[in-house]
Swiss-Prot record:
Gene Ontology MF terms: electron transporter, transferring electrons within cytochrome b6/f complex of photosystem II activity
Family designation: Belongs to the PetN family.
InterPro entries assigned: Cytochr_b6-f_cplx_su8_sf, Cytochrome_b6-f_cplx_su8
Keyword Disulfide bond in record: no
Role of this protein: Component of the cytochrome b6-f complex, which mediates electron transfer between photosystem II (PSII) and photosystem I (PSI), cyclic electron flow around PSI, and state transitions.
Segments crossing the lipid bilayer: 3-23
Origin organism lineage: Eukaryota, Viridiplantae, Streptophyta, Embryophyta, Tracheophyta
Name assigned to this protein: Cytochrome b6-f complex subunit 8
GO CC annotation terms, alphabetical: chloroplast thylakoid membrane; cytochrome b6f complex
Gene source species: Angiopteris evecta (Mule's foot fern)
The keyword Transmembrane helix is assigned to this record: yes
C-alpha cells in the first residue's frame, strides 16, 4: 500500500466524518 492510497482513504474518512457531524449539528442533536 502506497502513501497516496493511504492519504486518499484518510481524506475520505475525514470528509465523511465532518459531513455527518454537520448533519447531526443541523438536526439539533
Amino acid at each position: 500500500m502506497d502513501i497516496v492510497s493511504i492519504a486518499w482513504a484518510a481524506l475520505m474518512v475525514v470528509f465523511t466524518f465532518s459531513l455527518s457531524l454537520v448533519v447531526w449539528g443541523r438536526s439539533g442533536l
